[in-house]
Amino acid sequence: TGAEGYYNATLDYGDGCTTVTDGKGIHRYYYDPDGNILREEAPDGSTTTYEWDEFHHLLARHSPAGRVEKFEYNAAHGQLSRYTAADGAEWQYRYDERGLLSNITDPAGQTWTQQCDERGLPVSLVSPQGEETRLAYTPQGLLSGIFRQDERRLGIEYDHHNRPETLTDVMGREHHTEYSGHDLPVKMRGPGGQSVRLQW
């Protein structure tokens, strides 16, 4: 990264290989005919390799140290069903009849569950301890509220361009944001009236 915060690099696209030259040296990325990355070589000579199935699902990632991450998918929709970290820890993922994520089980056997509405938006999240977080949305599908134990923890109101305009926190305090014609935030006002102006 340069003094101005920019990343300077030169890219060379070859047949099945892309070479990136930056301040650290030369990085090489090798691909199969379908565009799946097979191998990446770092400037220090270390190599990371990847395995894919015929459906272009990533099956395994081999680190330079020989550690392996594994990925398994369900047959119904080709969605990730199990992730095994290099240390052997496993995460399991299950889906409902619509193919939407319904629960996640971590390596300790704890399960988080999720329910979605008819639009496919998550409306209920339940922790392994049974604590439920509910989510509410606008007719346009934008998040409008987060509730826990029937108490609103966060409220969001949008302007006519669907930009978050007012955030109401758990204490009922409002935080306002104003935007430019290019949809960039230009002024933020806190509950005490203090404001911050942003320039782009």
Feature map (PLM): residue ranges:
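Extended charged/polar low-complexity repeat regions
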Residues: 1-200
